[in-house]
Regions:
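Non-catalytic terminal extensions that flank enzyme cores
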Residues: 2-255
Length: 256
């Protein structure tokens, strides 16, 4: 137990990025896949570089080419690749493969997860800074139904490399938060920006679903994004789930 001295004030000690990835890797039961398409090719490497990944990473998928991505996950009705629909297809498809290929009778204690992202970074003309969807489907007890966290981010940095690096850090924070902060979703939101400059990215949509989050009101978390300065505006639907404002208001007439 750490020594406490008179006059001390409580504070939270933020684990380093390497410590977060290593804690995941050193857990005997956490086991899953990474699927990253488009420009978001940075998350899995943190888990490889910190060591101990052989018992954690079942597979990494990098489907950069659009035709190859369509061949795996199917073509979207709107032909978009950076979308919530594509992200959910990736999560479901990769989890299905994991369940199919890993014998549960031989791996009774395994906690399966799938992390996925689909991202576009800043364009050559630097007019469109880029955005992306990322998410994780996971369980904290063997054979329990999966819970899911999905989020949409917008980049504010002005070069591709910086955007990719920031996304990689946030991906590690999301995976770590899913397993070790799922009982405190509001805190989990804050931890997504560990080791990231708040001005580098914006989170404008996040949804928590599944058995771990049955008592969570996503509308409250949506407002928390605004309170924390992670975004300027949020939107949610009648079902209580958060919506992407840019998508819902695209080409719509608005009266304010």
């Amino acid at each position: 137990m750490a020594i406490a001295l008179s006059g001390d004030h409580p504070f939270e000690n933020t684990p380093s990025l390497e410590a977060k990835a290593l804690r995941i890797n050193l857990n005997d039961n956490i086991y899953g896949t990474f699927a990253e398409i488009g420009a978001g090719q940075e998350v899995a490497r943190h888990f490889f570089r910190c060591g101990g990944a052989s018992g954690t990473i079942a597979k990494t998928m990098s489907a950069y080419d659009k035709d190859f991505s369509d061949a795996i996950y199917g073509r979207e009705d709107d032909s978009r690749y950076v979308s919530e629909s594509r992200l959910n297809k990736m999560l479901d498809w990769e989890m299905g493969l994991l369940e199919k290929r890993i014998d549960r009778t031989k791996n009774k204690d395994k906690l399966f997860f799938t992390y996925a992202n689909t991202v576009t970074t800043i364009d050559f003309a630097k007019k469109f800074k880029g955005h992306g969807w990322m998410g994780i489907q996971f369980q904290t007890k063997p054979n329990e139904p999966y819970s899911t966290i999905t989020t949409h981010v917008r980049f504010r940095e002005n070069d591709t490399k910086s955007q990719q690096l920031s996304l990689g850090v946030m991906g590690v924070n999301l995976i770590y938060g899913a397993f070790y902060q799922n009982d405190r979703p509001k805190k989990l939101l804050q931890y997504l920006f560990d080791h990231i400059d708040r001005d580098s990215m914006e989170i404008d949509t996040i949804n928590f679903t599944g058995p771990l989050f049955e008592d969570i009101d996503n509308r409250v978390l949506s407002l928390e994004l605004v309170r924390l300065g992670m975004t300027d505006a949020v939107m949610f639907g009648p079902d209580g789930n958060n919506l992407l404002p840019a998508r819902e208001l695209y080409k719509k007439n608005i009266i304010a």
